[in-house]
């Protein structure tokens, strides 16, 4: 089950999907799995079992990790890498996956990541959300 449309985007309301567990054991297992997947996303940017985004996972190789949700359109990756090149950041590891009209790109970079990088990446026409971990 999915949250009611009128609750999406309401300040202070955090909508989560129905887990569908039918026994105490499965409820616990589903809750633990969901918590682990959410923790992995928050700490590492990895996405597992998302309804809206593709599954994307890569091991951390050090440095900073940049996670970008963007429209799946030509030129999106070159815009991202162009900004990173201009900032003198080296891409150590990168993965990009799309699902229909949305894509998710994770990049592990080395170099001096300054505070303005999030704003620069957010300014890309195709960018939806940018996080630097």
Question: Where on the chain are the PLM-derived regions?
Answer:
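A conserved regulatory-domain signal marking ACT and ACT-like small-molecule sensing domains
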Residues: 48-133
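Rossmann-like dinucleotide-binding domain for NAD(H)/NADP(H)
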Residues: 1-60, 104
């Amino acid at each position: 089950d999915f949250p009611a449309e009128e609750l999406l985007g309401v300040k202070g309301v955090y909508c989560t999907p129905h887990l569908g567990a039918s026994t105490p054991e499965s409820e616990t297992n589903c809750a633990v799995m969901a918590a682990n997947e959410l923790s992995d996303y928050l700490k590492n940017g990895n996405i597992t079992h998302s309804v809206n985004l593709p599954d994307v996972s890569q091991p951390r190789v050090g440095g900073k990790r940049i996670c970008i949700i963007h429209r799946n359109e030509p030129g999106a990756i070159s815009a991202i890498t162009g900004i990173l090149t201009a900032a003198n950041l080296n891409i150590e590891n990168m993965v990009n996956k799309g699902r229909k009209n949305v894509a998710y790109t994770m990049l592990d970079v080395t170099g001096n990541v300054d505070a303005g990088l999030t704003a620069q990446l957010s300014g890309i026409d195709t960018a939806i959300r940018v996080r630097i971990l």
